[in-house]
């Protein structure tokens, strides 16, 4: 390394190795921080005062050791400090010229600093004074504080937050809302971290570029190769860095650029600062010279500190004023010293910018990349499997080779944020590809920081830059800071994540937040930009049978939200080819195994790769996945299963390859149990449908969710309440169009599900069943009703979720929502906001009330954000890192806009809902009546039916769904659970007992179709339900009732047990919840809640929401507190439930449903079943799909508000149970009759199943019990059930409407009250203002009157005035009055109007008004030092005339303020008193000047002369300030003549002779000095200059008049 001066690095190294520092390093136990502080401060101030090279010898070392081996500060140093010379010198360098010249003494320096906002304070916050600094013996603490203040002043001059932000903007990006520094220290950390992140990015890019040719695991050793290459290519002096280079060669993969969290603690090794130096001065400070280790040793730290000091000495004017120990041990007392050094660095690099300062630019990387790209004209080669494997093994090791630059042009349709469009490839080594300069997610940095802290507890967590998690090891390139590394093999075209998520370090919260932002933030839209719709659809056919999933890599890290990477190319092998399938919009939720993903990644280096890098995604056992061989091969309806994410933690590691991770298609990608929402967030809904179809190869939509992906060609603008595909005639809402075309026709039709609740429930359920279904793929099967129905269901579900989660939508977009959000993002709708809102909602949802309200508030949100996203977001939110980095918080403005848009949509939706609700309510009433009659008849005829048997349910499911229910027991158990739950909760909420049974994908799809149809028909057919169906429903209901009764008895006894068993129950509970959600009525959905410990689960909130949905239905979305509480309670027990949904892949032991879980289909089946139940119940309850058409339209309105809560809950459970219930839509219409709504509180028969139900109900109802009696849905005769459900639904809707109206009324009342208060306050304010104005006007009139009279008197004086002004009688009166006024202390106060304002001063003499005794002079007292200006007095100041001396004259009619008061008050009318001060002079002579027996003769003679004279104004002459009477003079204001009347003194007094003027205060009987130099009528006495007195001249008795 050769510095600017030409000295070699070796020389510097030798110099640094000089014995003093190297050998004499003070060990920590002997290091004296206090001494070090004194030495550092003194060295700094001396260097600044004299210049480092000109410091006097005796000051260079401030310490000396005496004969007793005691160390002391040298006397010259102490003398300098006490003299303030050093301080003045240094301070003058900071101040401007004029100010600097005035610096004399410590006080002036302290004041100068305080003017700059810097206060000299000791450590105990006591201010340092001049006395402290001048104190002898010296008080070092005060002087250290002074030096610290000067250092801070220097620091402020050299660096500021604005300068730092401006500097960082040039090479990086940051989140203004989250990362803006709040003080100078934070600004320094911010700057250093940003530079280090930039260096990470640069070095990672360099390494990738160098290693790009390597596709073998060898690329994992870039550090070694780099070091070798560097050493070979660069003629660097080896001597300096032999040791370090050796380390490079031996073990170093890449330099680790640390990120600081604490300036002193984290910066003490010098690595971060050296990285900054290298960034700005790459030639002077070689990167290889710096020891950049993640965990540097002390030797490394010393090496770095020496290097830093050497650089400072050589290039920065020796600004490093610390010792090695100071920097190494970094005691807090030295923080000001370190800060001033960093400020100086910043100043040199950003302000001075010497020639050697040449910041590294990314351009060099770009150039290198260009070269590399030119090298290979062919599109980037897909990453080899070996490379992928190696990458999977250690993502960090991934080399650029693995991530070939995406030469593939972005599809025109893909509007990606190319943070670095030119740098799409993931940076191996955990280098985050996003350059700080490219804002991925502005807010992510902080979030990343949090997530990093969580994720990488062992790492030093430094504030993350946008690009990467601070604490993340550079070696790991993780797109998402999931705890798992994900392969970054695929460079994502998605510039948003900038080079595939691999950019981000494994711990990089940025990546995570990016993914999050995708789901939550408008960034999602960016991702979506790449959606097929946006991107050109090269070929309609699916590419390589890969569905969008190939483009979208979704992985759910336990905490990581979905990491959906949308690839531009569908074809794994032709990355350069944009997704060919026009259906690309269809998202295949199928999950690829990591290998699959890797292949896909390889194939699509350019495609978006948001999926978090995971070490190797564990493939859940196939047995646990609901994946058929067909699905795996992509032949079946691979329902893009969002591998349901473990309930936020219940089974975080379980990843389902929903679609058969092992399949050859991308769909097989291992799917981390990403909540549907997560999955959706990453997946573009538009891509989902068509793509999934492609992926399937059959064009069948993966059962991802009933998302009807937006038509391939069109971008899903967002979820639309409009029944895109819904056949309103049938009263069914098609969330997804049944056919691809329908999908196209309706971009995301109503997804009723509460984003949040659905997200949670649906996430779980769908993740299990639909996991992929709902969110991921609603691929449209070109004519498949199933897919359409599923999509419809999903949409309905999402609508409900929206209602519930609309508020929550932002927290988690349901998968569909996420997809849609992504698509919407691309399209225009910002799902991000939904996701964010959903997240917020979940958080509040956890508070529950917020969930329902928020969602209701934003129906669109739910649509746009199905529950899965919510879950995903919730997880993130719950995890601190997530929260901090949540993109939601990131784009505040964007969110605000989204919120506004959502609000508008919500209003429109609510209006529509109201209409639909009215229709559905009427329909329900009719159906309810019919059902009731049927039930009554049936009940009489049949008597109490026997408890439903699992087989019975199964049959019903089969019948209704037209599908075989694999687990009838599941239903029954779920039903029983519901019953028990009802009993336990005594909640009136309808719980859907039907459990989803695992089904074959086809079956599920069919079931979904049927369900959709049945649900859709339910509403329509509810009225048309055959009597037979009603009878069947009634029979079932009766059986259910008996069962429930039995169950209730057991439940009462086993509540505790049930709660403990709840984990098993939860699944059914979840299903029930889903059903409940759909029920929408008091239906409280028992959604499996994540264990209390599972923060990620939103379900509990949803439950609350579900219950509250109706309540919350009003835009207020307020969840009844009891419900919220109940939700919370249910949450707690629900954890097991929620866990179950998540653990759909959990062993059967968990739940009756669990048996299904092993196959992974059970959840789906259960979901379907529950969905069927929903559909069946929806016939009456919330067939989300069917009810949604008629009911949903109206209910969506209501539900979104009411159901939003209840649906959120229900959907939480139902989505968990039904996997978004939409998935179950396959069930035949028959299912509608299979459910019967039963008041859980009515059922009392304990039953084995009842226990199960009880468990679930205890979970579910635990929250509900407070809310409402639980109503359970049981499979009964479809007709009867429908009737019951219709009635209950109608009643529930009416109840919700009433509640909403009441809430609105309350709200309006509150608003009216608030408005009244405001009006009252405004009125009072107006009255006060008017009163003040009137007072002002009155005063002005008085003043004008006074001036007029004054003028008139002046005229009279000139002419006739004297005789009138002379009257003695008025004069005495005025005197008396004045005296009385002054005595009262409120002379002028006597005049209420004018004096009221002036009285403050009028009561006192002008001087006395100040009430400063010192100023006032008693006749015999000592002169007062304080001068009160009359003008300062209120009266005088108030009078505009005051500006002239005349003012004094006017006021001087009475020399005291009393006299002034006279003018303002009634005394104004006494012209004599106003123009003559004779009474005042009379009083002064009598009571002050010549008081007492001794002076009586003299006094009498003086008074006689006074009475004889006709003059208006008199002046007393004093000898001096002692106020010793000498003579009485007459004063003519017109001529300003003062001539002697009697006494000893000059015959006349001129202006020049006057020394001081006094005014007499009659009340205080003393003279007060007037701060004026000119005579006026207000003056009562004066003194002349001392030299005018002749000592010989005899004087009047010289008895000093003491001031009274």
Curated annotation (Swiss-Prot):
Record-level GO cellular component terms: cytoplasm; microtubule; microtubule minus-end
Biased composition (Polar residues): 1125-1137, 1382-1394
Biased composition, class Low complexity, residue ranges: 813-824, 847-858, 1395-1412
Protein source organism: Rattus norvegicus (Rat)
Keywords associated with the record: Coiled coil, Cytoplasm, Cytoskeleton, Microtubule, Phosphoprotein
Lineage: Eukaryota, Metazoa, Chordata, Craniata, Vertebrata
Compositionally skewed regions (Basic and acidic residues) per UniProt: 784-806, 874-886, 1113-1124, 1246-1258, 1298-1348
Domain description: The CKK domain binds microtubules.
Name of protein: Calmodulin-regulated spectrin-associated protein 1
């Amino acid at each position: 390394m050769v510095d600017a001066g030409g000295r070699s690095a070796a020389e510097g190294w030798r110099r640094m190795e000089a014995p003093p520092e190297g050998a004499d390093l003070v060990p920590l136990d002997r290091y004296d921080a206090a001494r070090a502080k004194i030495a550092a401060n003194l060295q700094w101030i001396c260097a600044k005062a004299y210049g480092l090279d000109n410091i006097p010898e005796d000051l260079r070392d401030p310490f000396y050791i005496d004969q007793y081996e005691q160390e002391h500060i040298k006397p010259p140093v102490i003398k300098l400090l006490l003299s303030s010379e050093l301080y003045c010198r240094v301070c003058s360098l900071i101040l401007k010229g004029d100010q600097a010249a005035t610096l004399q003494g410590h006080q002036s320096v302290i004041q100068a600093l305080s003017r700059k906002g810097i206060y000299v304070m000791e450590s105990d916050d006591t201010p340092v004074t001049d006395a402290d600094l001048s104190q002898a013996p010296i008080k070092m603490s005060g002087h250290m504080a002074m030096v610290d203040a000067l250092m801070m002043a220097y620091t402020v001059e050299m660096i500021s937050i604005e300068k730092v932000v401006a500097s960082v903007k040039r090479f990086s990006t940051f989140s203004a809302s989250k990362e803006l520094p709040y003080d100078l220290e934070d600004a320094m950390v911010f700057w250093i971290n940003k530079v280090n992140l930039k260096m990470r990015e640069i070095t990672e890019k360099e390494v990738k570029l160098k290693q790009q040719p390597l596709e073998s695991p060898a690329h994992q050793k870039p550090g070694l190769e780099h070091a070798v290459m560097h050493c070979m290519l660069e003629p660097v002096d080896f001597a300096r860095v032999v040791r370090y280079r050796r380390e490079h060669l031996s073990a170093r993969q890449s330099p680790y650029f640390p990120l600081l969290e604490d300036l002193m603690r984290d910066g003490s090794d010098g690595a971060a600062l050296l990285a900054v130096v290298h960034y700005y001065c790459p030639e002077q400070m070689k990167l290889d010279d710096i020891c950049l280790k993640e965990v540097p040793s002390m030797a490394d730290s010393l090496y770095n500190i020496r290097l830093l000091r050497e650089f400072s000495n050589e290039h920065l004017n020796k600004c490093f004023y610390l010792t090695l120990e100071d920097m190494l041990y970094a005691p807090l007392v030295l923080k000001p010293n370190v800060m001033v050094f960093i400020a100086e660095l910043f100043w040199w690099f950003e302000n001075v910018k010497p020639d050697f300062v040449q910041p590294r630019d990314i351009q060099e990387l770009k150039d290198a990349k260009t070269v590399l790209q030119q090298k290979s004209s062919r599109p980037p080669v897909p990453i080899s499997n070996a490379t992928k494997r190696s990458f999977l093994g250690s993502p960090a090791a991934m080399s650029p080779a693995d991530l070939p630059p995406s030469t593939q042009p972005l599809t025109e349709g893909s509007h990606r944020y190319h943070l670095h469009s030119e740098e799409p490839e993931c940076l191996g080594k955990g280098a985050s590809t996003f350059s700080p300069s490219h804002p991925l997610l502005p807010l992510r940095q902080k979030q990343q920081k949090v997530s990093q802290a969580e994720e990488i507890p062992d790492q030093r967590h430094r504030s993350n830059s946008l690009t990467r998690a601070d604490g993340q090891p550079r070696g790991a390139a993780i797109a998402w800071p999931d705890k798992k590394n994900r392969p970054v093999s695929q460079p994502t075209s998605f510039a948003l994540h900038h080079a595939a998520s691999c950019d981000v370090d494994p711990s990089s919260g940025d990546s995570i937040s990016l993914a999050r932002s995708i789901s939550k933030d408008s960034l999602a839209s960016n991702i979506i930009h790449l959606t097929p719709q946006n991107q050109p659809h090269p070929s309609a056919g699916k590419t390589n049978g890969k569905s969008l999933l190939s483009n979208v890599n979704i992985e759910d890290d336990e905490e990581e939200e979905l990491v959906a990477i949308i690839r531009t190319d569908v074809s794994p092998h032709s990355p350069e080819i944009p997704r060919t399938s026009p259906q690309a919009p269809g998202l295949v939720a199928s999950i690829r195994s990591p290998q699959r993903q890797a292949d896909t990644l390889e194939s699509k280096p350019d495609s978006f790769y948001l999926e978090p890098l995971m070490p190797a995604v564990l493939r859940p056992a196939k047995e646990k996945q609901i994946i058929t061989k067909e699905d795996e091969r992509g032949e079946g309806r691979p329902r893009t299963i969002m591998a349901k994410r473990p309930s936020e933690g219940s089974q975080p590691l379980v990843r389902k390859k929903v679609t058969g991770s092992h399949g050859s298609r991308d769909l097989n990608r291992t799917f981390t149990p990403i909540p549907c929402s997560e999955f959706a967030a990453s997946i573009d809904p538009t891509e989902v449908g068509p793509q999934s179809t492609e992926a399937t190869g059959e064009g069948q939509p993966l059962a991802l969710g009933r998302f009807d992906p937006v038509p391939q060609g069109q971008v899903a603008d967002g979820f639309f309440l409009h029944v895109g595909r819904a056949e309103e005639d049938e009263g069914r809402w098609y969330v997804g169009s049944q056919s691809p075309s329908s999908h196209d026709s309706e971009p995301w039709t109503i997804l009723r599900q509460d984003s949040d609740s659905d997200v949670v429930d649906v996430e779980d359920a769908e993740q299990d069943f639909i996991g992929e279904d709902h969110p991921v793929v609603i691929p449209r099967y070109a004519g498949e009703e199933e897919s359409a129905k599923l999509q419809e269901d999903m949409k309905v579900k999402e609508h409900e979720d929206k209602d519930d989660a609309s508020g929550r939508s932002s927290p988690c977009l349901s998968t569909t929502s996420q997809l849609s959000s992504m698509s919407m993002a691309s399209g225009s709708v910002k799902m991000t906001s939904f996701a964010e809102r959903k997240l917020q909602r979940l958080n509040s949802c956890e508070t529950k009330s917020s969930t329902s309200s928020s969602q209701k508030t934003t129906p669109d949100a739910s649509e746009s954000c199905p529950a899965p996203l919510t879950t995903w977001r919730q997880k993130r939110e719950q995890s601190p890192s997530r929260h901090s980095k949540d993109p939601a918080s990131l784009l505040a403005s964007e969110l605000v806009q989204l919120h506004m848009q959502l609000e508008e949509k919500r209003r429109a939706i609510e209006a529509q809902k109201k209409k639909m609700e009215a229709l559905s309510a009427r329909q329900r009433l009719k159906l309810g009546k019919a059902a009731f009659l049927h039930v009554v008849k049936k009940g009489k005829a049949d008597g109490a039916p026997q408890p439903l048997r699992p087989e019975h349910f199964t049959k019903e499911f089969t019948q209704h769904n037209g599908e075989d229910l694999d687990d009838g027991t599941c239903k029954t158990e779920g039903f029983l659970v519901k019953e028990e739950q009802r009993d336990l909760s005594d909640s009136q909420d309808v719980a859907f007992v039907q459990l989803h049974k695992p089904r074959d994908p086809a079956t599920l799809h069919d079931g979904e179709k049927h369900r959709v149809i049945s649900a859709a028909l339910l509403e329509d057919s509810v009225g048309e339900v055959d009597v037979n169906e009603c009878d069947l429903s009634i029979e079932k209901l009766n059986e259910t009732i008996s069962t429930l009764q039995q169950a209730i008895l057991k439940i009462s006894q086993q509540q505790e047990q049930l709660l403990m068993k709840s984990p098993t129950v939860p699944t059914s509970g979840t299903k029930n919840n889903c059903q409940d959600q759909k029920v929408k009525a008091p239906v409280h959905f028992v959604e499996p809640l994540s264990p209390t410990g599972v923060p990620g689960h939103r379900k509990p909130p949803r439950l609350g929401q579900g219950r509250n949905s109706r309540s919350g239905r009003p835009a207020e979305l307020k969840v009844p507190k009891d419900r919220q509480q109940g939700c919370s309670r249910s949450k707690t027990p629900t954890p097991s439930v929620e866990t179950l949904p998540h653990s759909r892949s959990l062993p059967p032991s968990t739940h009756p449903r669990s048996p299904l879980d092993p196959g992974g289909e059970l959840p789906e089946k259960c979901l379907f079943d529950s969905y069927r139940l929903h559909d069946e119940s929806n016939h009456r309850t919330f067939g989300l799909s069917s009810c949604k058409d008629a009911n949903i339209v109206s209910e969506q309105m209501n539900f979104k508000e009411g159901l939003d809560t209840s649906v959120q809950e229900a959907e939480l459970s139902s989505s968990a149970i039904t996997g978004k219930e939409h998935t179950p839509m396959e069930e035949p219409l028959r299912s509608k009759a299979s459910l019967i709504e039963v008041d859980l509180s009515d059922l009392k028969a304990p039953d084995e199943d009842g226990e199960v139900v009880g468990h679930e109900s205890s979970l579910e109802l635990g929250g509900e019990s407070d809310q409402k009696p639980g109503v359970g849905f049981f499979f009964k005769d479809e007709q009867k059930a429908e009737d019951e459900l219709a009635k209950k639904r109608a009643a529930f809707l009416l109840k919700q409407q009433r509640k909403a109206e009441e809430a609105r009324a309350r709200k309006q009342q509150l608003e009216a009250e608030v408005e009244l208060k405001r009006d009252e306050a405004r009125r009072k304010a107006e009255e006060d203002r008017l009163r003040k104005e009137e007072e002002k006007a009155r005063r002005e009139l008085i003043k004008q009157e006074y001036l007029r009279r004054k003028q008139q008197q002046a005229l009279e004086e000139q002419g006739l005035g004297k005789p009138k002004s002379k009257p003695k009688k008025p004069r005495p009166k005025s005197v008396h009055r004045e005296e009385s006024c002054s005595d009262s202390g409120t002379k002028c106060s006597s005049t209420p109007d004018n004096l009221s304002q002036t009285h403050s001063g009028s009561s006192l003499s002008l001087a006395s008004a100040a009430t400063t005794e010192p100023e006032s002079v008693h006749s015999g007292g000592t002169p007062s030092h304080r001068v009160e200006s009359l003008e300062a007095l209120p009266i005088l100041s108030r009078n505009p005339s005051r500006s002239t001396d005349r003012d004094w004259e006017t006021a001087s009619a009475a020399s005291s303020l009393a006299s002034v008061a006279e003018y303002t008050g009634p005394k104004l009318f006494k012209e004599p008193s106003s123009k003559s001060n004779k009474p005042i002079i009379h009083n002064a002579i009598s009571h002050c000047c010549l008081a007492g027996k001794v002076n009586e003769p003299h006094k009498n003679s003086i008074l006689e002369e006074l009475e004889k004279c006709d003059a208006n104004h008199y002046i007393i002459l004093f000898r001096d300030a002692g106020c010793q009477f000498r003579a009485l003079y007459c004063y003519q204001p017109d001529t300003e003549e003062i001539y002697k009347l009697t006494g000893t003194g000059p015959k006349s007094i001129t202006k020049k002779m006057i020394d001081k003027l006094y005014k007499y205060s009659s009340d205080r009987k003393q003279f007060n000095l007037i701060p004026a130099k000119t005579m006026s009528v207000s003056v009562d006495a004066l003194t002349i200059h001392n030299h005018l007195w002749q000592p010989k001249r005899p004087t009047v008795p010289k008895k000093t008049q003491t001031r009274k």
